[in-house]
Structure formats: structure tokens, C-alpha cells
Amino acid sequence: DATSGIFAMDMDYSKLDVITWSWQKVLGAEAAHGMIAISPRAVERLETHIPPWPIPKLFRLASKKKLIKGIFEGGTINTPSMICVEDVLDALKWVESVGGTKGSIKISSENLKICEDWIAKNENFKFMCEDKNLRSSTSITVLIKDEWFTKHDEEGQRGVLKKLFSLLEKEGVANDINGYPKAPPSIRI
């Protein structure tokens, strides 16, 4: 799953046999759709492996020991609306306008650096992922560590964050920055 990395981080594609990504994550386009890219090694495995159970049509990439080429030549598994397609085309034009993948990677890295600098100056916050080498530039998750917040139990913290996020959205500052539901109460940028 390259959703969090593609267009935002250097990826060694020679080591990746199958790559999937959504149009939403880094590109900011429609969330319901995505893409798949496969290597020649993956094609070989698809054409030689016979699964012991039936594969649902939606997930079938090979039939009768042959790659189903249509989906890699412009066919679709599930038809997206043309508005969604235009949305991702606009997103790709933006990537091209900022210097291609190198430009979008640079922007992603710079955004992470801005957050790192801000957190370094604000002792009330910390990254959920404390190891800088493992920290993602596309799913930056921040914890509030000040006592006014940590004195609440988890439910109370989530309530405080819900009010905060509502205010930020109302003021036009941020949208959809709530941490993942199974993560500790957090801010996800």
C-alpha cells in the first residue's frame, strides 16, 4: 500500500512488485477511487499461481493463467464518475506544476519540517511517533501533552478535541484533522 508514500516520499520502485494508492491521500482528490501498478514479476506470479479458492470478480487480475490486461490499459474494475476522474487529473496537473514527484516530495518534506519546528517551540505538544526516522510526512499525528488536556480520561480528551476541531472548521482553519479512531486522542495533519 503506497497510499501514504506515493507522490510524497522517495520510493524504490524496483523493490515494489505491486503498488496501490488512493487518489485522495497525497493528491487530495476523490477518496473512493485508487490505482494499482504491478511489476513483471507480479504478472508472472499472477499467471502461474492458481488460488485454492474463487477470487471475487472485483479482485481478479488474472483469468485462465493470463493477466486481465484491460484494467491496465484503461479499463475499470468499478466505473468511477467522470467528475472524480477530472478531479484526479487536476491533482496530477498540480503535481506536474510543482515539479512532478520531486516537487511534491519537497513540499511534503517542507510541511513536515514546519510541524517539527513548531512542535520544538511548543512544549504542550509532541509527535505521536517520537522516532524522527519513522515519522510520516503524510500522516503527521500530534498529541497534546499539557495537563489541562491530559487530566481528562480518554473520553473526555476526545470530547475536548471534538469541540476544538469544530471551532477550527467553523473558523476555516482546518478540516478533518481528528486522529484515527483507534489511535489515542490526537490531531492528524
Task: Write out the residue ranges for each language-model feature.
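Active-site C-terminal subdomain of aminotransferase-like
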Residues: Q24-E116
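Conserved active-site segment immediately N-terminal to the catalytic lysine
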Residues: D12-Q24, G34
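General beta-strand structural signal in soluble alpha/beta enzymes
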Residues: D1-A2, I19-S22, N175-I177
